[in-house]
Amino acid sequence: MSMERNAKTPASEVRLQSGMTAVITGASSGIGAATADRLARAGMRLILVARRADRLEALTATIRSTGGAASMLPADLALDSERVRIFQAVERAGGADVLVNSAGLGWYGYYSDMPWATALEMIQVNVAAAVHLTSLFLPHMKSRGQGHIVIVGSIAAGIPSQGVALYSGSKAFLDAFATSLHRELRGTRLHVSVLRPGPVATEFFETSAARPASGPIPARRFAIRAERVAEAVWSVIKRPRRVVYVPGVLAVVPWIEASLGWLMDRLGPLHLRARRIRA
């Protein structure tokens, strides 16, 4: 199966070989599932990872029914042992050319109201899973002389907001982690990229609101489709870059935070306070 290419490939794009293998975490829904569909259509072999086996089975079957190549690895990314098991299974299957860390959890409300069990789960899935899997796959990619790690971050990393303290913090960590790795590996055929999407219209909002003591996330009204993020993942695999904003207009966010952060300091808590009063 040939990789999808433009008629003319810019010099900045990598030469993609037929049948490259991508591991996608959080593949049972949302950005992960949309990315699986996009990369399958581009001709990549997929190894899909998520906790919900029934969702993975359905997605794998759909991809195969359209001529794609996909296999599934149900796993709980909150557990160290499960991450090691994922890596070992991928190694036995021939290794990975691309690792897409897209698994993530959310929660909305005052951090002081956040149950520690929920906070710990978010740290394990949003941060530890991406860092641990990167530490497992990166040496393997170095031994092969090439590879690409894509981390799905969030614009929340660049504009910390009320109600998402730990989520913003987890994404800011990933942002700094990915940027540091990108600079360490500069000049090699190993790439690390971070995506900074705005709110994305997925069931993330429902699952976040359903967590203990959480509430509806107001940013949902501005959400974009998961397919736009998936297209950005494919774009950055073809043409590696350190960071990609989705949509591109969000590139102004760091400037807004630097220039108008004082306004967020004053207005930020108002929505949360109003929600608490209504409750």
What are these language model-derived features?
Residues 28-29:
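Conserved glycine-rich cofactor-binding loop
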Residues 44-58:
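Conserved glycine-rich Rossmann-like NAD(P)H-binding loop of the short-chain dehydrogenase/reductase
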Residues 102-107:
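Conserved NAD(P)H cofactor-binding loop of Rossmann-fold oxidoreductase domains
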Residues 110-111, 118-123:
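Substrate-binding pocket helix/loop in short-chain dehydrogenase/reductase
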Residues 134, 170:
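Active-site helix of classical SDR
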Residues 154:
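Residue(s) in the substrate-gating loop at a strand-loop-helix junction
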Residues 184-250:
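SDR active-site lid
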